[in-house]
């Protein structure tokens, strides 16, 4: 069944209510998806894109009900990925000589998928036009790496419709086609999820490409995407959101995610979150167990956040596999303007923390101090976690803290004057163990109240057995 988009433009795509995985199993399409194909019937008949390959036969049969396939004059392929051009082989078997208009890179992609170099390819580049009669033209705009090298958009003059390819789309299936007909909360959640998980790596390209398109000074009455809704009501709203999201986007939000073997790291996550909330109640904090949560929801929250705390138990002296995989994915997504801190519990060694901190730094995050706890955290260890959260809230605050929390901090500092007189706490740079002068280290005959300067030179870190030379002043206390 076709749907009139505008005048002589019809949607001839395919809804996919059941799909739950995309890009293999990397993207969870919890609300299904659609594969949008458009038929333009002017003096020349143009088909823009096809559908996913698994619907090839159904697509060609439905298209045959709309038009004699021999009457299709041109096929435009904005993107060669299988969910866009997947039905080409089935269609071209019926009309093998029909010209295909696409970018030079798309020819390589199409042949790589379909293996038909004999098809009638016609290369287009930015600014090229194709006259389709009745005073209307198609104008082509290359958009390489949004999100494949072959990508382009197509603009139809007269009707002022931009066929935008993957940009401005969402994996969202609904019986209605237009943006003003669907649930707005669901729609914009899926738009942001789509951008965060698919287009984030190319944010640096989004703004200049949108600026280039706007530079054509062409009116845009509708944006017809390759997935999800057609934007007919205020279509520029999604363009404005893309410009916002592309500009090193962050909200006053912190995401905490972790994996754990014995719930020890979960206890740390909860305590850290408590400390953040105590110090800055304005900040939104979300906690996820990666083993039980939707990975794409976690990544969307990271995209929205000013910072992320990542927790892992130590297993075989490295981080938990699900954490390693998610950090690798964050590396590929290339988030910008975000801070990070690693935390976790361990038994006899804590190698995961150092490895995790390094990986987060390699992923482009600005790193804050990490935090370790040995075995199951007791009340003292949980208080250290809460204090870590308080310090994170202070360091990552986007605006001056509320006066009530500032007063609390001042009061705590006043009550701790005696402790402060003992000098700073010191942290082992290898295992992150903290020496607190107020507590000393009775196991090595270092009495409570002993400043670091008076600790014997033969002192060894209780965790990793290294000497005083590997200790640094605790970063949160450095002046």
From Swiss-Prot:
User: What does UniProt give as GO cellular component?
Assistant: cytoplasm
Q: Does the keyword Cytoplasm apply?
A: yes
Name one molecular function that GO assigns to this entry: electron transfer activity
Q: Which SUPFAM superfamilies match?
A: Flavoproteins, Metallo-hydrolase/oxidoreductase, Rubredoxin-like
Its chief place of residence is cytoplasm
Domain Rubredoxin-like span(s) in chain numbering: 423-474
Q: Which residues bind FMN?
A: 260-264, 342-369
Query: Which coenzymes or cofactors are required?
Result: Fe cation; FMN
Q: Which PROSITE patterns match?
A: FLAVODOXIN_LIKE, RUBREDOXIN_LIKE
Compartment annotation: Cytoplasm
Does the entry feature the keyword Phosphoprotein, yes or no? no
Kindly tell me the pathway this chain contributes to: Nitrogen metabolism; nitric oxide reduction
Sites binding Fe cation 2 sit at: 83, 166, 227
Which keywords does this chain's UniProt record carry?
Cytoplasm, Electron transport, Flavoprotein, FMN, Iron, Metal-binding, Oxidoreductase, Transport
Q: Function, please? A: Anaerobic nitric oxide reductase; uses NADH to detoxify nitric oxide (NO), protecting several 4Fe-4S NO-sensitive enzymes. Has at least 2 reductase partners, only one of which (NorW, flavorubredoxin reductase) has been identified. NO probably binds to the di-iron center; electrons enter from the NorW at rubredoxin and are transferred sequentially to the FMN center and the di-iron center. Also able to function as an aerobic oxygen reductase.
**Belongs to which family?**
In the N-terminal section; belongs to the zinc metallo-hydrolase group 3 family.
This protein is called what?
Answer: Anaerobic nitric oxide reductase flavorubredoxin
């Amino acid at each position: 069944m076709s749907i009139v988009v505008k005048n002589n433009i019809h949607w001839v795509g395919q809804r996919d209510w059941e799909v739950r995985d995309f890009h293999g199993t990397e993207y969870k399409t919890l609300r299904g998806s659609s594969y949008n194909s458009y038929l333009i019937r002017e003096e020349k008949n143009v088909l823009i894109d096809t559908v996913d390959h698994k619907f090839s036969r159904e697509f060609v049969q439905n298209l045959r009900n709309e038009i004699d396939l021999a009457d299709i004059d041109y096929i435009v392929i904005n993107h060669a990925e299988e969910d866009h051009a997947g039905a080409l082989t089935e269609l071209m078997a019926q009309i093998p000589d029909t010209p295909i208009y696409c970018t030079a890179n798309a020819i390589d992609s199409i042949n790589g998928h379909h293996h038909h170099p004999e098809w009638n390819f016609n290369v287009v580049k930015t600014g090229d036009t194709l006259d389709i009669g009745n005073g209307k033209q198609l104008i082509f705009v290359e958009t390489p790496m949004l999100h494949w090298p072959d990508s382009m958009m197509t603009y139809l003059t007269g009707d002022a419709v931009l066929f935008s390819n993957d940009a401005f789309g969402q994996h969202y299936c609904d019986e209605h086609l237009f943006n003003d007909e669907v649930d707005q909360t669901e729609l914009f959640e899926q738009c942001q999820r789509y951008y965060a998980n698919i287009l984030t790596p190319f944010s640096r390209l989004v703004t200049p490409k949108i600026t280039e398109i706007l530079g054509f000074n062409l009116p845009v009455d509708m944006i017809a995407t390759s997935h999800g809704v057609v934007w007919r009501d205020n279509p520029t709203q999604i363009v404005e959101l893309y410009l916002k999201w592309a500009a090193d986007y962050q909200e006053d939000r912190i995401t905490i995610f972790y994996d754990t073997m014995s719930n020890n790291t979960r206890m740390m996550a909860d305590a850290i979150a408590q400390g953040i909330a105590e110090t800055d109640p304005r900040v939104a904090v979300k906690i996820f167990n990666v083993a039980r949560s939707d990975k794409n929801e976690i990544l969307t929250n990271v995209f929205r956040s000013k910072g992320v705390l990542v927790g892992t138990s130590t297993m075989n002296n490295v981080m938990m596999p699900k954490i390693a995989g998610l950090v690798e994915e964050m590396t590929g997504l290339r988030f910008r303007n975000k801070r990070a801190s690693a935390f976790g519990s361990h038994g006899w060694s804590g190698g995961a923390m150092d490895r995790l901190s390094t990986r987060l730094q390699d992923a482009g995050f600005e790193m804050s101090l990490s935090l370790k706890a040995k075995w199951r955290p007791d009340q003292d260890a949980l208080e250290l976690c809460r204090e870590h959260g308080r310090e994170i809230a202070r360091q990552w605050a986007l605006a001056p803290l509320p006066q009530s929390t500032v007063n609390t901090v001042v009061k705590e500092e006043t009550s701790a004057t005696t402790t402060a007189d003992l000098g700073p706490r010191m942290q082992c740079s290898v295992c992150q163990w903290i020496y607190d002068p107020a507590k000393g280290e009775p196991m090595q005959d270092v009495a409570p109240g002993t400043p670091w300067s008076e600790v014997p030179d033969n002192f060894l870190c209780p965790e990793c057995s290294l000497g005083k030379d590997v200790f640094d002043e605790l970063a949160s206390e450095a002046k």
